[in-house]
């Protein structure tokens, strides 16, 4: 990325714990789990909602938060954890595939204008919604890019739901890659700050991750390479060793700065890494039944 543009973003990235390692353990963030539905089927992804969702990883949330509860929930969070600077939407599905995401962002923009607005997405719909995100004053967007070669990506993503149709295998992979790259470039031109997350899967994309960095280096502020958590249809695969992770990050760092302090957080994460109970307490205090949905109601 151009150094002048990086400097332009400094006032935001210096206080965003997922873009700046130096303040990762000092500045808090809150994830609002308002987006349950997803439009792609990653073979390593198993979303969990409800009381059984006790794991601390992406795709997991105790509950789906409704937009009408966002204001009171954020008021509680900010009262208890005043070092919160960033509010993000990271699932448990794909943010851009859920209308509740945009309803929530509008509420935040009106009621909490001083919070940095952030979201995570698989990027399939980014080229459709990048301008809407900018208009809602979203500042940072994280896009998960696991391959830019369809032959590799088809081993990671089983299907893609796009344009009212399910696309399997290489067909779906091609659509996803094309939309991701197009969306990232358009978001960059709109002055959105882009981070890419890449899941390192040794037996599938380890020798390919550097190609992602080369391809996107002019449009991405930072890259976050995270180890595979062997789940779902990749439960038989191994995660990378520390040495493998280190080596791939060093190779990619020649092209894009690397983020090395990721906690692979839940969709309802709040505060610093250790602070995880606010959402449950919030619903108990409201004497309200948890708004939990069965995953069968949503596409993967």
Swiss-Prot record:
The lineage of its organism: Archaea, Methanobacteriati, Methanobacteriota, Methanomada group, Methanococci. Its cofactor is [4Fe-4S] cluster. It holds the Pfam family Radical_SAM. The gene is nifB. The keyword Transmembrane helix does not apply. S-adenosyl-L-methionine binds at residues 93, 144, 196. This is FeMo cofactor biosynthesis protein NifB. Residues 24-266 form the Radical SAM core domain. Monomer. Its EC number is 4.-.-.-. It comes from the Archaea. [4Fe-4S] cluster 2 binds at residues 262, 265. GO terms for molecular function: 4 iron, 4 sulfur cluster binding; lyase activity; metal ion binding. It comes from Methanocaldococcus jannaschii (strain ATCC 43067 / DSM 2661 / JAL-1 / JCM 10045 / NBRC 100440).
């Amino acid at each position: 990325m151009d150094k002048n543009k990086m400097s332009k973003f400094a006032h935001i990235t210096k206080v965003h714990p997922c873009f700046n390692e130096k303040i990762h353990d000092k500045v808090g963030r809150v994830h609002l789990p308002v987006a349950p539905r997803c439009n792609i089927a990653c073979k390593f992804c198993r979303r969990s909602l409800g009381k059984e969702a006790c794991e601390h990883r992406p795709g997991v949330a105790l509950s789906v938060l409704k937009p009408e509860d966002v204001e009171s929930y954020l008021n509680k969070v900010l009262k208890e954890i005043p070092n919160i600077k960033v509010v993000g939407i990271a699932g448990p599905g794909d943010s851009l595939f859920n209308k509740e995401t945009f309803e929530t962002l509008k509420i935040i923009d009106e009621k909490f204008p001083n919070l940095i607005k952030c979201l995570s997405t698989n990027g399939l719909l980014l080229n459709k919604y990048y301008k809407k995100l900018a208009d809602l004053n979203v500042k940072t967007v994280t896009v998960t890019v696991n391959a830019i070669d369809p032959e590799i990506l088809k081993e990671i993503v089983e299907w893609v739901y796009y344009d009212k149709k399910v696309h399997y295998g290489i067909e779906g992979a091609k659509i996803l890659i094309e939309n991701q790259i197009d969306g990232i470039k358009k978001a960059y031109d709109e002055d959105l700050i882009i981070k890419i997350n890449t899941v390192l899967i040794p037996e599938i994309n380890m020798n390919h991750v550097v190609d992602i960095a080369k391809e996107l280096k002019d449009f991405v502020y930072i890259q976050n390479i995270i180890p595979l958590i062997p789940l779902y249809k990749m439960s038989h695969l191994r995660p990378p060793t520390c040495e493998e992770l280190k080596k791939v990050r060093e190779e990619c760092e020649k092209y894009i700065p690397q983020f090395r302090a990721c906690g692979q957080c839940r969709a309802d994460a709040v505060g610093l890494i250790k602070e995880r109970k606010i959402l449950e307490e919030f619903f108990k205090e409201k004497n309200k039944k948890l708004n939990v949905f069965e995953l069968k109601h949503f596409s993967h």
